From Swiss-Prot:
Keywords for the protein's UniProt record, in alphabetical order: Ribonucleoprotein, Ribosomal protein, RNA-binding, rRNA-binding
Protein name: Small ribosomal subunit protein bS20
Disulfide bridge positions per record: none
Bias-annotated ranges (Basic and acidic residues): 1-11
Record family assignment: Belongs to the bacterial ribosomal protein bS20 family.
Lineage: Bacteria, Pseudomonadati, Thermodesulfobacteriota, Desulfobulbia, Desulfobulbales
GO biological process entries: translation
Single annotated GO MF: small ribosomal subunit rRNA binding
Function: Binds directly to 16S ribosomal RNA.
HAMAP family (UniProt xref): Ribosomal_bS20
Region (Disordered): 1-30
Top-level taxon of the source organism: Bacteria
GO cellular component, one term: small ribosomal subunit
Species this chain originates from: Desulfotalea psychrophila (strain LSv54 / DSM 12343)
């Protein structure tokens, strides 16, 4: 329980930010999950489209500061590598 007015305000701000970050992170996870499903199906056209969406969502999440820039880069790299392996096979 906050004892100061500024601490109470900070708690309110943190709650709003937490909900905003959670929403952004969930959207990112959903786009990656969609890509995973496309990879399992093995359809190249769907996979390429899902990859574009996932990359966009991951980059947007990083630009908002929800995840670190290098974490986003690593995720994008790994997903792209998986898609390229499917295309090459």
């Amino acid at each position: 329980m906050a004892n100061h007015k500024s601490a109470e305000k900070r708690n309110r701000q943190n709650q709003v930010a937490r909900l905003r970050n959670k929403s952004t992170r969930t959207a990112m996870k959903n786009s990656v999950r969609k890509l995973d499903e496309a990879l399992e199906a093995g359809v190249e056209a769907d996979t390429a489209e899902a990859l574009r969406g996932a990359i966009s969502r991951i980059a947007k999440t990083a630009s908002k500061g929800v995840i670190h820039k290098k974490t986003a880069s690593r995720k994008i790299s790994r997903l792209t590598k998986r898609v390229n392996a499917l295309v090459a096979a």
